[in-house]
Amino acid sequence: MTPETGLIKGPDRKQRCWWGADSEDYRAYHDDEWGQPVADDQRLFEKICLEGFQAGLSWLTILRKRENFRRAFRNFDFHKVARFAQRDVDRLLQDAGIVRHRGKIESTINNAKRARELEKEFGSLAAYFWQFEPPKGERPAHLDRAALSSLAKTPTSIALSKDLKKRGWSFVGPTTAYAFMQAMGLVNDHLEGCHARRRIATARGAFSPPSKA
């Protein structure tokens, strides 16, 4: 890895963000998902929930359990998860395929109820979340590893976190909110020189952010 740029060359000889070359799982996630602009409500809900489950853990741990989470939480259909009852909490606490943390499980159910309220108000979760695409002035002029390391949270992620908490969401601190923004394409945080950066920039350029219904 080049320390200044944060780039590393994978077994396929492609330059990637340093974290995206650690394992085959990470490479696929980095190359095919991370930073692609997303407007699908279930995927948005899934991601913000999984970011909450990640708190205190590595993303690779969550990524390797993602299919188990999808099975356990009805593919993160928030209309279905919002109807979960205590028996579902008890069931999930016995599920070794997921992170068995009562607070995070109960938070996911609570957030599903709050997601339904957002859908009613904005027409979709996508319309709500894409309001928080940050202004260009908040973005670094050149994105190397040092610049990326300074972006654990930003004014926009702080604003998103505050607004979600005001609306009753939990496990949505500003660092979690920024990781969500990175993954769902509200920002392009592939480093300069990463083979995926230009492709993500093109996808973002062609993307029309949903608006409030």
Stretches with model-predicted labels:
Residues 1-213:
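HhH-family (HhH-GPD) DNA N-glycosylase catalytic core used in base-excision repair
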